């Protein structure tokens, strides 16, 4: 998993509440078990019309935001079903950070497992960031995981809380497999001891 330390990039404003996982990646794209290739279908029903043409008004179809790496969204982002394809699609598009007043619990935890930093901030601070994001490509936000801060293009700084274990996993690029591999020596030692103690197993 890619490490996350500091990110300076374009933030796309998505001022919608209750953005559920079906909006993030519709059910027809859930057949794959690959984590790559889903970015083109991120927010599919909002990005494309029935003929597959881009809807110009949608934020990620606008030239200023096509290379966005941050999303600033409304309350309860990632609600709905627990599909892990949602963070897969977000990551595959190029988004590494989502900022919102709140997140659905399962989506929130899935983000960390896929190298995405979800940041929960008070509504009034999200409103400031939303306005900053609306400035377009010339306005770049900086997210510093080490200091747990978000800095606007105007230099305004907001601090966020984060579980130390989740922070470590992101900064070191550790997913579930990586965490297991950290303990591989202890696992091997246990298995050898268990085999000697119970050779009949």
Swiss-Prot record:
Any one GO molecular-function label of the UniProt entry: 3-isopropylmalate dehydratase activity
Keywords annotated in UniProt: Amino-acid biosynthesis, Branched-chain amino acid biosynthesis, Leucine biosynthesis, Lyase
Keyword Amino-acid biosynthesis: yes
Enzyme class of the recorded protein, top EC level: lyase
GO cellular component terms, A-Z: 3-isopropylmalate dehydratase complex
Stored Gene3D superfamilies: Aconitase, domain 4 (3.20.19.10)
Coiled-coil annotated residue ranges, if any: none
InterPro entries in the cross-refs: 3-IsopropMal_deHydase_ssu, Aconitase/3IPM_dehydase_swvl, AconitaseA/IPMdHydase_ssu_swvl, IPMI_Swivel, LeuD
Pathway(s) this gene product operates in, as recorded in its UniProt entry: Amino-acid biosynthesis; L-leucine biosynthesis; L-leucine from 3-methyl-2-oxobutanoate: step 2/4
Catalytic activity, EC: 4.2.1.33
Matches recorded under SUPFAM superfamilies: LeuD/IlvD-like
A Pfam entry, by short name: Aconitase_C
Subunit and interaction comment: Heterodimer of LeuC and LeuD.
UniProt cross-references to HAMAP family, sorted A to Z: LeuD_type1
Family indicated by similarity: Belongs to the LeuD family. LeuD type 1 subfamily.
Its job: Catalyzes the isomerization between 2-isopropylmalate and 3-isopropylmalate, via the formation of 2-isopropylmaleate.
Record-given protein name: 3-isopropylmalate dehydratase small subunit
Organism: Roseobacter denitrificans (strain ATCC 33942 / OCh 114)
Gene: leuD
């Amino acid at each position: 998993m890619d490490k996350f330390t500091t990110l300076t990039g374009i933030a796309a404003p998505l001022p919608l509440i209750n953005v559920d996982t079906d909006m993030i990646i519709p059910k027809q794209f859930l057949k794959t078990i690959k984590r790559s290739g889903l970015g083109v279908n991120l927010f599919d029903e909002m990005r494309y019309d029935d003929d597959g043409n881009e809807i110009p008004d949608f934020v990620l179809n606008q030239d200023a935001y096509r290379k966005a790496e941050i999303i600033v969204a409304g309350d309860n982002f990632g609600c709905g079903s627990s599909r892990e394809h949602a963070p897969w699609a977000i990551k595959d598009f190029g988004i590494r950070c989502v900022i919102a007043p709140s997140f659905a619990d399962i989506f929130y935890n899935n983000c960390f497992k896929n190298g995405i930093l979800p940041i929960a901030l008070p509504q009034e601070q999200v409103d400031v960031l939303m306005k900053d994001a609306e400035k377009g490509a010339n306005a770049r936000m900086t997210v510093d995981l080490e200091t747990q801060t978000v800095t606007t293009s105007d230099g305004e700084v907001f601090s966020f809380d984060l579980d130390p274990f989740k922070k470590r996993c992101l900064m070191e690029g550790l997913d579930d497999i990586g965490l297991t591999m950290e303990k591989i020596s202890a696992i091997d030692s246990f298995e050898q001891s268990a085999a000697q103690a119970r050779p009949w197993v």
